[in-house]
């Protein structure tokens, strides 16, 4: 669910996922069920079972249903801008977002299969101290307050999202995020990269 420039290769991969969705055979065992079939189109970018293997694409495996559904609604409605994600969010909403959200929430989350800069992660741990007030010491977030987990997401994805928040290009004008964006404006690009490395390292 990344707001970034799309490429022809990624569109082809996503199109392949749509073809799988249409032509998917019956699957027995733990993959059986409506959520699995409906989520096939997502796997082209987000990986098998939602375990992303790329820097800029988030992990969906183990994602709480409330946050997955919020993200889909935000993309589909245009509140979260992404020409790449908007049509897929609308498709997921039409197919049945509850089934897809439940499928990804039930998937085991694998250790992040990406290299993490240890020195950057160490610096990021220090920089993340003010973030812990909302996201928790270990980055798990707080569902009761609508605060998502940050831990174990790819560093490239986290960095991109932090840059978007800092520039007020994600959730623009949302009152609950005013203080967050003000804090991020005090961080330079290198510090945001360190923060991303730290939270990504929690998934190793």
Regions found by a protein language model. Give the residues of each.
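The feature marks the first
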Residues: 32, 37-77
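Axial heme c-ligation environment in periplasmic c-type cytochrome domains
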Residues: 53-59, 75-108, 112-117, 144-149, ...
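Bacterial N-terminal signal peptides that target proteins for export
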Residues: 2-15
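Sequence/structural segment immediately N-terminal to covalent heme-attachment motifs in c-type
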Residues: 28-49, 112, 116-140, 153-154
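Disulfide-stabilized extracellular ectodomain repeats and their linkers
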Residues: 39-42, 57, 65, 82, ...
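Bacterial N-terminal signal peptides
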Residues: 13-23
């Amino acid at each position: 669910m990344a707001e970034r420039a799309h490429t022809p290769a990624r569109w082809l991969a996503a199109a392949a996922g749509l073809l799988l969705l249409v032509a998917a055979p019956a699957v027995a065992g733990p993959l059986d069920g409506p959520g699995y079939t409906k989520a096939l189109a997502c796997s082209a970018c987000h990986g098998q079972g939602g375990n992303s293997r790329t820097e800029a694409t988030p992990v969906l495996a183990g994602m709480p249903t409330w946050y997955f559904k919020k993200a889909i609604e935000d993309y589909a409605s245009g509140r979260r801008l992404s020409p790449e994600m908007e049509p897929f969010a609308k498709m997921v909403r039409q197919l049945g977002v509850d089934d897809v959200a439940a499928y990804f929430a039930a998937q085991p989350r694998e250790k992040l299969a990406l290299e993490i800069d240890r020195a950057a992660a160490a610096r990021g741990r220090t920089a993340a101290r003010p973030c812990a007030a909302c996201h928790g010491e270990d980055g798990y977030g707080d569902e009761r307050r609508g605060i998502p987990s940050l831990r174990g997401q790819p560093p490239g994805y986290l960095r991109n999202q932090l840059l978007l928040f800092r520039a007020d290009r994600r959730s623009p004008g949302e009152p609950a995020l005013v203080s967050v964006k003000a804090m991020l404006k005090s961080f330079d690009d290198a510090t945001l990269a360190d923060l991303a490395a730290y939270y990504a390292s929690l998934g190793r």
